[in-house]
Amino acid sequence: MRLPDVVLVALGGAVGSVARYGLGLAALRASGSGLPVGTWAANALGCIGIGIAVGLAPSDRVRLFAVVGVLGGFTTFSAYGAETLALWTAGRPGWAVANVLGSVVVGVAGVVLGLLLGRAVAA
């Protein structure tokens, strides 16, 4: 690991983490459902972002900052797992299953959309 690379990842991670926090607060206020829509939104946006990055094939420095840092700080499926378990243990197994299926479908669709967008911009 080189210090300049670590700094790029750390700065990107700070940006992504703050953005994720803001999105989570906004989604919590806006949503009246029991679903963790903030996590869905973060996962979908993160998947679109990584699809765009793959399509654009950025330089190593941009990839370290934007993909590893920003997107790594912005979205993680660990929150998805914890929220699914919380729904299940709260006696809401239907919502838990909906969260699992919805996250996978939205995530894969987001990567496809992002990849197509990234390739279109790069063309």
Identify the residue ranges that each predicted region occupies:
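Membrane-interface helix-loop junctions in multi-pass transporters/channels
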Residues: 1-123
